[in-house]
Design a protein with these regions (language model features):
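Local cysteine-cluster metal-coordination motifs and their immediate loop/turn environment
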Residues: 264-275
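Residue-level signal for short, function-critical loop segments
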Residues: 41-45, 111, 264
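N-terminal cofactor/phosphate-binding cores enriched in small/glycine residues
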Residues: 41, 49-50, 54-70, 107-108, ...
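Single conserved hydrophobic/aromatic residue that forms the stacking wall/gate
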Residues: 276-285
C-alpha cells in the first residue's frame, strides 16, 4: 500500500472502503495480462458493492484470458479531500495502481445522479474530462448501464457507450480493443470499427441539432455510424457466466447479504418505464 495512503486512512471514516484485500477479490499477475480495465462505479463502496450488475460484469470480464478487471469507487468527501491534499490519484482496489495507468476506464451508469461523480472521478484520476481532449487510444473511457439509454447528456465525455446489457458486448469490445492495441491502430480507426458492433454507440460520431427551446431535435451520424443503435439484450441468461463466488466485502454495505438474480425484466409493462421496451422477464434456470 502507498505510504501516503497509510498516513491518511486513520483520518477518514470507514477506511475499509479504500483498502481492498477482500476475500475472493481477483488478483492476477501483471506479467500475464495485456489488457487492464478499471471498472468504475460512480458512488461509494457500500453502494457499488451492493450492485449485482457490477458483480456480474466484474466476474465476466475477469473470465477473459489476459484481461484484468479491477474495481474503483468514488471516495467519500473526507477521503477525497485527503487524497487531493496528499496528491494521491484515484486508484484501483486490487492493485492500488492509478486509474490513469489502465488501458480502459469503464463506468457503470445506473442513474443520472451519478453524472457529477463520473466527472469528479476522472478529474481525481488526472484524466482529461472530454473525449476530444484524449486523442490517444489509451486510456479509453467508456460507459454502460441503464442511464446510457439517454446518452446525449454525457456524450462529450465518453469515447464509447454500451447500449443494453453488457455481458456479451463488453467482451466483444475488449477483444477488438486488444486487436487495436496489438496492431497499433489509431483511436479513430478503433472507434470506427467498434461502431459496427451491435449495442455500441460512439458519441463523437453524432452531430446533435437543437430546438430553439434547448431540447434535442435530432442527431446526424458521421464516420459511417448507424442512424439508430440497437441495444443488446441477453436472450438466454443461462448461457452467460454468473458468479457463484462473489467478493465478500470487508465492511458493511447497503445490501449486506447475498444477492441472487432470479430473472431479468418486469411483468408490469408500464409505458413510462424504460423496462417497457425490454423483453418480458427472462428467468435463470
Amino acid at each position: 500500500m502507498d505510504q501516503r495512503l497509510e498516513r491518511i486512512l486513520p483520518r477518514v471514516q470507514k477506511p475499509a472502503r479504500y483498502t481492498g484485500g477482500e476475500y475472493r477479490q481477483i488478483i492476477k499477475d501483471k506479467a500475464e495480462v495485456d489488457l487492464r480495465l478499471a471498472f468504475c462505479f460512480p458512488d461509494i463502496y457500500e453502494i457499488g458493492m451492493s450492485n449485482i450488475g457490477m458483480r456480474i460484469l466484474y466476474a465476466t470480464m475477469n473470465q477473459m484470458p489476459g484481461v484484468w478487471c479491477e474495481r474503483v469507487f468514488a471516495p467519500w468527501g473526507d477521503m477525497e479531500a485527503e487524497m487531493r491534499r496528499a496528491g494521491i490519484p484515484l486508484y484501483a482496489l486490487e492493485s492500488g495502481d492509478p486509474v490513469s495507468e489502465f488501458d480502459v476506464v469503464a463506468f457503470s451508469l445506473g442513474y443520472e445522479m451519478a453524472y457529477p461523480a463520473v466527472l469528479n472521478m476522472l478529474d481525481l484520476a488526472g484524466i482529461p474530462l472530454r473525449s476530444a481532449d484524449r486523442p490517444e487510444l489509451t486510456p479509453l473511457v467508456i460507459a454502460g448501464g441503464t442511464a446510457c439509454s439517454n446518452p446525449e447528456p454525457m456524450a462529450p465525455f465518453f469515447d464509447l457507450m454500451i447500449i443494453g446489457e453488457g455481458e456479451e458486448v463488453n467482451n466483444e469490445v475488449l477483444a477488438l480493443f486488444r486487436q487495436a492495441q496489438q496492431a497499433g491502430w489509431s483511436k479513430t480507426r478503433f472507434l470506427e470499427t467498434a461502431a459496427k458492433i451491435q449495442g455500441v454507440l460512439i458519441p463523437s460520431f453524432y452531430v446533435p441539432h437543437w430546438n430553439p427551446d434547448g431540447t434535442l431535435h435530432d442527431l446526424t451520424p458521421t464516420h459511417g455510424a448507424p442512424a439508430r443503435v440497437t441495444k443488446r439484450i441477453i436472450q438466454d441468461l443461462d448461457a452467460c457466466y454468473y458468479p457463484t463466488d462473489p467478493i465478500v466485502p470487508s465492511t458493511e454495505i447497503v445490501h449486506d447479504r447475498v444477492n441472487v438474480e432470479l430473472f431479468r425484466g418486469c411483468i408490469r409493462g408500464c409505458r413510462f418505464c424504460l423496462l417497457y421496451t425490454s423483453p418480458s422477464p427472462r428467468d435463470r434456470g
